[in-house]
């Protein structure tokens, strides 16, 4: 009934099952703006802190490099991206008060004409922006926020597909 080093077989089996488990990633929508793949920085060197879940506490997090950007909406119109509520991901609060299950579900809330495409025909299209955090400090400034039209982005297909990619 005891396995390795006197540990019960059940505990040993559970340990072996979970030792390589990693939680599923629930990243917000990020755009590859220079066609070289989405590049990220880990929490090892430069520490970026950001309030993902809108609890008022900025915590260390992985982040995108400044040549890529987060899709954002300044929901409180204060000129900055304050928390994950203003990104499009699992921390986005939907109109029914529930959190989105992913960034595409969050963005789909803005598909005002229901055609599964987010574009100029949708009421909020002109308000959605891309945040390129040039100084990698997790605090948005006016010069880091770009309109979709400034970047030549005309639409998003809201029919999400799943693809697992190791970003390093």
Task: Give short role names for the model-derived ranges.
Residues 3-168:
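Calcium-binding acidic motifs and repeat modules
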């Amino acid at each position: 009934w005891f396995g390795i080093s006197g540990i019960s077989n059940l505990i040993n089996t559970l340990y072996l099952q979970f030792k390589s488990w990693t939680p599923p990633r629930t990243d917000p929508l990020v755009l590859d703006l220079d066609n070289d793949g989405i590049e990220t920085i880990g929490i090892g060197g430069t520490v970026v802190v950001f309030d993902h879940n809108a609890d008022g506490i900025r915590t260390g997090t992985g982040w995108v490099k400044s040549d890529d950007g987060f899709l954002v909406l300044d929901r409180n119109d204060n000129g900055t991206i304050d928390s994950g509520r203003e990104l499009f991901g699992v921390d986005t609060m939907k109109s029914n008060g529930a959190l989105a299950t992913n960034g595409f579900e969050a963005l789909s809330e803005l598909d005002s004409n229901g055609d599964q495409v987010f574009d100029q025909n949708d009421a909020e299209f002109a308000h959605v922006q891309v945040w390129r955090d040039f100084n990698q400090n997790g605090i948005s400034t006016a010069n880091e926020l770009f309109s979709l039209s400034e970047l030549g982005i005309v639409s998003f297909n809201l029919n999400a597909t799943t693809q697992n990619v190791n970003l390093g």
